[in-house]
Every structure is written in structure tokens, then in C-alpha cells.
Amino acid sequence: MTYIPQIPIEDLVYVEFKDHETSSTPAYVRHLKEELNRVCKDGNLNRTKHIIVFQSTSGILRVKGTLWMVGKEYVLLKQNVHIPISSIIAVQ
């Protein structure tokens, strides 16, 4: 298993996001949206924190937090922090 650095949610404002190479395949996007909606529901109902793995210009990173909303192009975490869906690799 490869080590993926975890950053504090507050540091996401300094991250430059990059599209993940599989973000354009329809099957991947559909599956990812289903997972994001499941995690969002869990976060809103149970205040559960999940790990979001994403692509940045400096490499693959992860952040742990509660997902509050899933939009068309972005997800919203606490403190009005957004991550582009096209950068997200996985949600755990």
C-alpha cells in the first residue's frame, strides 16, 4: 500500500487541484457521485468524517472531514472549503 499524505482541512485553501485522469469516464463519474452522495448523507445525519483522496498539482493527497454537500462540479466540506469532483480519486 502506498503512503498518501494527509493534510488538515484548513490547508485545502492553499492546494491547487488537478483533474484526475479517470475523471472523464462516465462509469467512473457515476460511481464516484453515488459514493459522494452516500458519504454526504452519512456526514449530515451522523456527523461522520470520511477520507477524501484527491489529485493536486503536487501529487495525491488526502483529507479527513465531513462532507456537507455534493454539487455539480464541487463538494463542500466544513469552513466553506470546496474540492472539485474532477480531482477526487476515492472516498473512504
What is the role of each PLM region?
Residues 1-60, 82-85, 90-92:
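Short glycine-rich, low-complexity segments
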Residues 64, 77-78:
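Beta-strand residues in well-ordered beta-sheet regions across diverse protein folds
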Residues 76-77, 91:
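Short hydrophobic/aromatic-rich beta-strand segments that constitute the beta-sheet cores
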Residues 61-69:
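Short beta-strand-centered aromatic/proline hotspots
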Residues 69-75:
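Short, conserved beta-turn/loop elements at beta-strand boundaries and strand-helix junctions
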